[in-house]
Curated annotation (Swiss-Prot):
Domain of life: Eukaryota
Protein name: Putative protein DDB_G0285185
Residue ranges of the region described as Disordered: 212-240
Ranges of biased composition (kind: Polar residues): 214-240
Coiled coil segments of this chain: none
Amino acid sequence: MENEEEIFKKLLKKASASSFEKIINLDLNNCSVDFNKYVLLLPKLINLKCLILSNNNTNQLPPFENLQSLEELYLRNFSVTPQQINKTSLSTDSDLTKSFITKIKTLTKLKHLVITGTKFDTNSSKDYIIHYLTTLETLNFERITNEKRQDVNNRIKLIREKHLINKSPTSAKILTTPNKTVVNRQQPQDLSTKKLVNTTSSIINISKSTPNKLQNQVQSSPKLSSPITKNKEQIVSTTSPQKLNNKVDFKLPPQIIDRNSPKHQPKIQSDVSSPLPIEIIPNIIEKTSDRLNGQSNLIQAISLLIGSITTLNDIDFIEDILYERKKILK
């Protein structure tokens, strides 16, 4: 079996050189016997410019990336047949081609390349070779023009853009859930939420009522004589101005009352304004909704009237209304 020194001598004899540094051109065409041994010595040929490896078969790709001075590479009918398929072997032609392009794209001085009759000789592979090797002048003895290089670069760009779009998270299909499944996953509606919705609806309905309608509801209620209702002296005594001021801070518009009539009976004009400004009714109801829950509409209305009193004139106005109502009920 030949030792390493004998392989060195054979390679130097083929190259007609006295040392590896002086080897500029190396022709290993159809060198099947010792080819794999010679390939192992290629990294030592740091000044090699022309390499011919045509008509050979090997079990691994030569270390082309180490030949940084290489200008010409001939691989006609060159084949690679891995001895075994494992995690590190080139199990497919696609893997083999990618590995080959990865190795030669680092050769920044390469000008001429021949790959006819190899697994690398495909349109896609040649496009990538032209794209990466910007110094390449001929490929398979065909000159590479600027127009051809530009066309190749455009094709590569489109391929990469398409690849990015396909890999984008936004391109994934969005799985939709049937409506009935969504309904089943919803949490049961809380009773307090339903109550809040009903309360809000009531507030909206009250805010839409006219001032006269609200006043008529208070005056025409059949429960005015409820035991809870106090006489006019009790209303005045139990309602402290200081306490009322803490609840509601607003002033009612002046009421039109004719004090010169007999018995000081008020004459309420048909277009008199409501004692409660319509814009503050929703706020009053919202503040007292929890306290008034479960009470009758009459009690709510009376409580709202009492809560709206801020001056003595307001009390006098309410007294007049109660007095008129009392006369009607008699």
